[in-house]
Amino acid sequence: MSDAVAQTGLLNEGRALVDTANEHNIALRLVGGLAIRVLTPDLPPRTSTGQDLDFASASATRRALTDLITERGYSPDKNFNALYGNRQLYFANPETGLSIDVLIDKFHMCHTLDFADRLTRLPYTLDPIDLLLSKLQIVELNEKDADDCLRLLVTFPLEDSSDAAAMDLRVFRDLMGQDWGWWRTVTMNLDRIAALLNDGDRPAIEGGKLDPRAQLEVLRQTAESAPRSRSWKMRSRIGERKRWYDVPEETPHH
């Protein structure tokens, strides 16, 4: 099976799960690379051999979602879900080999991102600004994640708007002004992505409609000009002498 065929199968299953959840009034949206593929259909797809589906959902419908996914042939990891189910759920389908990760209300990785208020803005995926931030918060950003950021940046304009066809700069600005750690990681990654662009063409964004360098500059200027909270200023005095990010823990599945 080719990668393209496998990814199409994953995408179809992801959409079907979202549709079924909607029929039961359960908020479920794709996140990660597959979500970015949905939002950037005119760009070359990210190469992936994974067999996992990543979703975002809400704590209020966690039990109903567990029942729904189980009815579709997936087995819940009962130990994992008992320990971490307030923030993440895991399921696996023994027949297809597919697995499902569901983030509840927030991303908890190098930094914490609360997406609950924006969960249902788009029909199949989490909001593009949240997808962008979920990548920019990675302290050890790799080239695939950088390309995912660029895919979003050449597709969606940055605006002070909740328009579904744009990325809402207000969300970005508020986060950059509230949390110095977030600001430090994001500005570091903006510089890394800009350096990648300077190294040569990025095939991942061939056909993009927006200038990635201009978009990166908008983000950089917004991060620098965001009104800064008292806690931001206090933490900035400590700077990098103290680790400003969390180290994501590896949580085994069974």
What are these regions (language model features)?
Residues 1-27, 40-48, 98, 104, ...:
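The feature captures the alpha-helical scaffold/lid subdomain characteristic of nucleotidyltransferase
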Residues 41-65, 69, 149:
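Catalytic metal-binding acidic patch
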Residues 7, 55, 59, 77, ...:
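Short gly/ser-rich anion-binding loops that grip negatively charged ligand groups
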Residues 32:
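Catalytic nucleophile loop
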